[in-house]
């Protein structure tokens, strides 16, 4: 068997700095009971009956004594990275204990991932909900942001069949 050496590829964008992202510290159930949970809908939950996802999550959290919620609905479309990070900073002013971000699909996954990463950078533990083909796009964005984030995206959410859910924790 002959081993063939592959030549390195030349990236026309040049060298790109890719800092390691440190995820926000995880919180306890007691922290969630005392604090506020941010629900961010990038407008995708308005399709079909997808809004039931947040309704059911809130019902389950209420069963655990977690009842302080704040909701935001805003599209990520048409915004660049700086605008998405600025929007995440605005969400962070609510001082949530944790955030749930949804919904990543083909058209919004990359931008919504940027919001989720920005929330993590601001110290807010964030769960990002997505499904194929959006989850593959999310993984790509996270790889660009840094590898440490990617393995955490491969866990299937409870009750999911077929598709891969992504978690940013």
Where on the chain are the PLM-derived regions?
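Short, well-structured alpha-helical segments in soluble
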Residues: 84-97, 115-118
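A charged, well-structured terminal subsegment
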Residues: 154-169
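Short glycine-rich or small-residue beta-strand-to-loop segments that form or flank ligand, phosphate
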Residues: 36-44, 70-74, 98-102, 127, ...
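Short, acidic/small-residue loops that bind anionic groups at enzyme active sites
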Residues: 111-137, 153
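Glycine-rich phosphate/diphosphate-binding loop of Rossmann-like nucleotide-binding domains
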Residues: 30, 34-68
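Glycine-rich, charge-decorated loop segments at or immediately adjacent to ligand/cofactor-binding or catalytic sites
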Residues: 134-146
């Amino acid at each position: 068997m002959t081993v063939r050496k592959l030549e390195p590829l030349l990236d026309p964008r040049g060298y790109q700095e890719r800092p390691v992202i440190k995820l926000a510290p995880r919180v306890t159930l007691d922290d969630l009971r005392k604090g506020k949970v941010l629900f961010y809908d990038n407008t995708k939950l308005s399709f079909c009956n997808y809004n039931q996802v947040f309704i059911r999550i809130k019902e389950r959290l209420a069963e655990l004594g977690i009842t302080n919620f704040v909701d935001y609905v805003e599209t990520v479309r048409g915004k660049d990275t700086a605008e998405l990070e600025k929007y995440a900073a605005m969400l962070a002013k609510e001082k949530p204990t944790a955030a749930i971000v949804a919904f990543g699909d083909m058209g919004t996954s990359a931008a919504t991932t940027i919001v989720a990463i920005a929330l993590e950078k601001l110290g807010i533990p964030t769960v990002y909900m997505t499904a194929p083909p959006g989850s593959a796009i999310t993984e790509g964005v996270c790889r660009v942001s840094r590898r440490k984030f990617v393995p955490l995206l491969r866990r299937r959410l409870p009750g999911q069949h077929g598709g891969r859910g992504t978690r940013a924790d």
